[in-house]
């Protein structure tokens, strides 16, 4: 199958390392696995920060900001995907790996500029309320692609929007490369929190910090609050600009006594990749139990993860304290976390499911 992947920047720079085994493969969304199986895979990138004309920004970006256009609609991404159309027409199926690229390419399908079947990896479409204008502009696009979600939390809401979306909404739980993310060495102690998505609940972690008797390292591109507790180190880390390499992230996971993933209570999965990567490294994880929990039947509190209520600093601090106070139980939690990822969250299974969804898109564009 000829499969064209359309990404935001940062993926192509990691492609050769992923192919050679020197870097993790999950950041290519299963493409490396499909390539190894003999499928013809191509990669393309679109920069949402590219310059766009003043008129385009006013007509598109401003209207999207007012929630009159589909979520994540962008003049720059529409222009960037338009330039890719000739090459994408040669593929059997296109996989858009972000909500922004999915919305843009579905727009070109709606305009009949692209006939190639489209699979869009989307998240957060329902985070903000939909008015009549957003509904009128978004539903026609959703009917022109197959939407792939990372967890079941958003699926009922999407399917309820329009009966014609039946069979077009699919769940494919994220999987990670357990050959790269693997245990190594002994932890040196401390608490690690890492992540850049907009749903990280850093405020709750900072509020919990005074009750955590350990140094807390936060790695993120987000700005720190004005006042930090004495035991919190806030360091810049940006995946796209590679301020921190994948091997350095792995070393940080391995060194941590516990990895904390505080997230806000939203319906989309958040903190998924960090949780799975840290778990694959055999580290105990404290994770917020949200509406968007991607695999509630597999993530079992006290067995392979510690789950805490959203926005509860006391519960978060108590869970971290529990891990720090009980090293034997923490080791058992980490071993169970690694086994769970190997059994239920491997990138190979993610790639196989993606191929299945691509075939469904080809059968029903």
Give the location of each predicted region.
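Short acidic/histidine- and often glycine-rich active-site loop of Leloir-type glycosyltransferases
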Residues: 227-228, 289-302, 306-307
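A short, well-ordered alpha-helix in the C-terminal region of glycosyltransferases
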Residues: 315, 322, 329-344, 350-353
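Donor nucleotide-sugar binding/catalytic pocket of nucleotide-sugar-dependent glycosyltransferases
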Residues: 143-159, 164-181, 188, 196-199
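Membrane-proximal helix-turn-helix segments that form the acceptor-binding/catalytic region
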Residues: 82-90, 125-147
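Acidic donor-binding loop of glycosyltransferase active sites
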Residues: 253-270, 283
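Conserved acidic donor-binding segment of nucleotide-sugar-dependent glycosyltransferases
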Residues: 196, 299-313, 322-327
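Conserved catalytic-core segment of nucleotide-activated headgroup transferases in glycan assembly
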Residues: 26, 187-249
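N-terminal subdomain of nucleotide-sugar transferases
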Residues: 1-49, 89, 210-211
